[in-house]
Amino acid sequence: MSIPAFTVVIPARLASTRLPNKPLADIGGHPMIVRVAERAHASSAQRTVVATDAPAVAEACAAHGIDAVLTRADHPSGTDRLAEVAAQLALPDDAIVVNVQGDEPLIDPQLIDDVAMHLAHHADCAIATAAHALHDVAEVFNPNVVKVVCDAGGRALYFSRAPIPWSRDDWAGVPAVPASAAQVPLPAMPVLRHIGLYAYRAGFLRRFPTMAAAPLEQTEALEQLRAMWHGERIAVLETAAAPAPGVDTAADLERVRALWAQGMAQEGP
């Protein structure tokens, strides 16, 4: 199967608690949101659109020839924002929309293509996403690292901040919250870390805002659990390696700037 037609939507908000004005942070002479859009343009997407509630972000995009749409500021989640964009663009129900986070300036364009293709290959699923095996046990027990377990067909069974699956034999005697993960072995069965890249069918995006919030979604603070609670299937693409780091904090921004500078230096004469 050839790569399906798809649209990339990049949500971008200025109101970040840990890094204010994050979409406009400079990376190599351009705002971060522009760098993310450049990576999306390098994929096979037919169109890339930035979705923002901030005129300053829309203006920065326009200055660099990037499509942007203004959305409401009161959306409870990024998926709700995507639903508004899908409606504004009048996308048909079977159209594929890939949600690329606005703080991923180093995202691999091939991964964007792969997730879109994965959804196209799973006609029974409304959503596709990605995951990779963890090799650091500290990340297994880190609640900020979301884990996913899948069925035999690679469809998500559950997402959690807890270490899942719990390896009874490998972790015999290990408390659920160990004082230190340094002495805890990696289990025989791989633990998969969820990668926050999603492909959706536009019809699902139209349904999502009408779905009642789910207790599991609220408990784990993971909006994909709302979809699963209401019976939607999620296809999970397992990748061989972790993606490039995103930007959540000022320290992350400096690290990405350094990586970007190294890449630009390697490309130079």
Curated annotation (Swiss-Prot):
Does the record carry Acyltransferase as a key word?
A: no
Q: What is its main location?
A: cytoplasm
Q: Name one GO biological process term.
A: lipopolysaccharide biosynthetic process
Q: Which chemical reaction does it catalyze?
A: 3-deoxy-alpha-D-manno-oct-2-ulosonate + CTP = CMP-3-deoxy-beta-D-manno-octulosonate + diphosphate
EC id: 2.7.7.38
Q: CDD domains from the entry?
A: CMP-KDO-Synthetase
Record keywords: Cytoplasm, Lipopolysaccharide biosynthesis, Nucleotidyltransferase, Transferase
Q: In which pathway does it act?
A: Nucleotide-sugar biosynthesis; CMP-3-deoxy-D-manno-octulosonate biosynthesis; CMP-3-deoxy-D-manno-octulosonate from 3-deoxy-D-manno-octulosonate and CTP: step 1/1; Bacterial outer membrane biogenesis; lipopolysaccharide biosynthesis
Q: Where in the cell is it found?
A: Cytoplasm
Q: Which Gene3D superfamilies match?
A: Spore Coat Polysaccharide Biosynthesis Protein SpsA, Chain A (3.90.550.10)
A Pfam family this protein belongs to? CTP_transf_3
**GO MF annotations in UniProt:** 3-deoxy-manno-octulosonate cytidylyltransferase activity
Q: What class does this enzyme belong to in the EC scheme?
A: transferase
Q: Which GO terms describe its cellular component?
A: cytosol
* SUPFAM superfamilies xrefs: Nucleotide-diphospho-sugar transferases (SSF53448)
Which HAMAP family does the record cross-reference, listed alphabetically? KdsB (MF_00057)
Instruction: Tell me the NCBIfam families matching this sequence.
Output: kdsB (TIGR00466), PRK05450.1-5 (NF003952), PRK13368.1 (NF009905)
The family line of this record is: Belongs to the KdsB family.
For this protein, the record's PANTHER family field holds: 3-DEOXY-MANNO-OCTULOSONATE CYTIDYLYLTRANSFERASE, 3-DEOXY-MANNO-OCTULOSONATE CYTIDYLYLTRANSFERASE, MITOCHONDRIAL
- Say what the protein does: Activates KDO (a required 8-carbon sugar) for incorporation into bacterial lipopolysaccharide in Gram-negative bacteria.
Question: Know the name of this protein?
Answer: 3-deoxy-manno-octulosonate cytidylyltransferase
